[in-house]
């Protein structure tokens, strides 16, 4: 495993570590990729585009606890600030703007509901929206900012006609293949046994050790390996057909041109593979509790693939003018035919990973396969299987993108919502394109940069 503290960084508030122990799958994963001609060259944090790596986690190595945003930034000194009040269990209903028709709209207050009681709090300077990719656009639309015709259809009076709000939704859809492990091999599925679960919890509560204190995942960023030149050219032609469609929004036209170039770059991955040492059951869904419920008898690992640069796009919009109503979410995953083919080809290659000597010796000979009873090798079958099994990776992004307004953008380079003077967005909804991997670090980086921008603008005012 190649990783240096200097590359990861050690001075920030968010803690990152690899846990205190490893499973047999960690080393086998690296050896498997090496045997397939893809050794680890360097830590991806340094910019390595392709190859396997052991996945770090946002785990504090001293306490073995999650280093989440509140733990990292909401320290005791911060919570004592007199200009900070945190209210939980409240639902923001809308942003109220002044009634002037001249110039950009200015937010004057926030209306919210808590325990059935409605409240209004004044906004003397700015309103910062950090409600996430699905609810930031919902709040803008509830406040009259969005596609004017859509707002009117729900009885909302348009204030700023901004068609990009809620559009451009992107996500990394994952397809999971499950393999039964050899007798004696560890698996998270063993936690079904109350005694095993109790022992794991006891070890963790004692000193942070045991399986609950580890970072169990290993990953790889990879190009599409078994992809003959003529087939690759056909895939590019599929994208070109999209670009030739006169109805394609200018937003997607520019994005597809960029993504097409990435597909041709041998140093740029088209998918990420992840090994998770437990079973995933997409057919048991749609609830996450059922998908991760480990209800299938036996002990398994899952290998998943997710497209690094999907072309498929979805949307999220209000379902009514009622703030309590959930928005309508269209994930759009695997909507573009090029995504379907790429996902299928990467899924087929997951079977090849398990056939390497390093991985095969950890799996039960003739063991159960959760995704399909037989090896998946044909493209058409793989495409159908991907459509059946695909799940969200919960990396939703892009619904209030930082792009030019004429290209479907919602926020400017200073994070301000077009048509407003004092409303900013600080979350993953402002990504024009979803990053190729997990979005957590990028969200933290955006928030850090946003803090700098806000302070700079306040200093000028």
Model-found features: residue ranges?
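Structural detector for helix-capping/boundary residues
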Residues: 72, 90, 125-126, 400, ...
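Glycine-rich loop(s) and the adjacent beta-strand/alpha-helix scaffold that form part
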Residues: 94-230, 234-240, 321
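FAD-dependent oxidoreductase catalytic-site/capping-region signature
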Residues: 2-46, 55-56, 211-436, 440-442, ...
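Conserved redox-cofactor binding core of oxidoreductases
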Residues: 1-94, 98, 106-107, 177-180, ...
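Marks the mature luminal ectodomains of secretory-pathway proteins
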Residues: 66-67, 84-88, 95-102, 121, ...
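Short loop/edge segments at beta-strand edges and connector loops
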Residues: 88-90, 160-162, 404
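Loop/turn elements at helix/coil->beta-strand transitions in domains of secreted/extracellular proteins
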Residues: 81-85, 124-126, 421-423
């Amino acid at each position: 495993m190649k990783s240096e503290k200097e590359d990861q960084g050690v001075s920030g508030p968010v803690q990152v570590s690899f846990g205190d122990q490893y499973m047999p799958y960690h080393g086998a994963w690296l050896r498997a990729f090496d045997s397939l001609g893809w050794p680890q060259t360097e830590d991806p944090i340094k910019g390595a585009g392709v190859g396997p790596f052991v996945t770090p986690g946002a785990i504090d190595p001293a306490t073995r606890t999650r280093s989440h945003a509140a733990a990292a930034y909401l320290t005791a000194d911060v919570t004592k600030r007199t200009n900070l009040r945190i209210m939980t269990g409240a639902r923001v209903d809308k942003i109220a703007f002044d009634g002037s028709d001249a110039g950009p709209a200015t937010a004057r207050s926030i209306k919210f509901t808590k325990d059935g009681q409605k409240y209004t709090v004044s906004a003397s300077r700015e309103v910062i929206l950090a409600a996430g990719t699905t609810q930031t656009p919902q709040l803008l639309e509830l406040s009259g900012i969005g596609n004017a015709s859509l707002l009117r259809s729900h009885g909302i009076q348009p204030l700023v006609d901004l068609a990009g709000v809620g559009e451009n939704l992107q996500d990394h859809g994952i397809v999971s293949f499950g393999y039964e492990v050899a007798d004696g091999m560890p698996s998270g599925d063993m936690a079904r046994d109350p005694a095993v679960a109790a022992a794991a919890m006891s070890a963790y509560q004692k000193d942070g050790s045991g399986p609950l204190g580890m970072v169990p995942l290993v990953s790889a960023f990879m190009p599409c390996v078994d992809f003959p030149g003529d087939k690759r050219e056909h895939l590019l032609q599929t994208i070109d057909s999209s670009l030739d469609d006169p109805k394609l929004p200018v937003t997607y036209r520019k994005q597809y041109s960029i993504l097409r170039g990435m597909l041709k770059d041998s140093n740029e991955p088209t998918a990420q593979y992840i090994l998770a040492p437990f079973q995933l059951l997409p057919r048991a869904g749609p609830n996450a509790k059922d998908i991760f419920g480990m209800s299938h008898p036996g002990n398994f690992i899952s290998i998943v693939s997710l497209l690094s640069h999907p072309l498929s796009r979805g949307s999220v919009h209000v379902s009514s003018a009622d703030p309590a109503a959930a928005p309508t979410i269209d994930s759009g995953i695997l909507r573009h035919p090029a995504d379907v083919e790429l996902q299928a080809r990467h899924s087929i290659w997951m079977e090849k990973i398990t056939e390497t000597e390093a991985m095969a010796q950890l799996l039960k000979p003739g063991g159960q396969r959760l995704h399909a009873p037989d090896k998946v090798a044909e493209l058409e079958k793989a495409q159908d299987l991907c459509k059946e099994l695909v799940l969200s990776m919960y990396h939703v992004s892009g619904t209030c993108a930082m792009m030019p307004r004429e290209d479907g953008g919602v926020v400017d380079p200073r994070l301000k919502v077009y048509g407003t003077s004092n409303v900013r967005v600080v979350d993953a909804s402002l990504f024009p394109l979803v990053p190729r991997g997990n979005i957590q670090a990028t969200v933290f980086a955006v928030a850090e940069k946003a803090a700098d921008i806000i302070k700079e603008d306040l200093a000028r005012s």
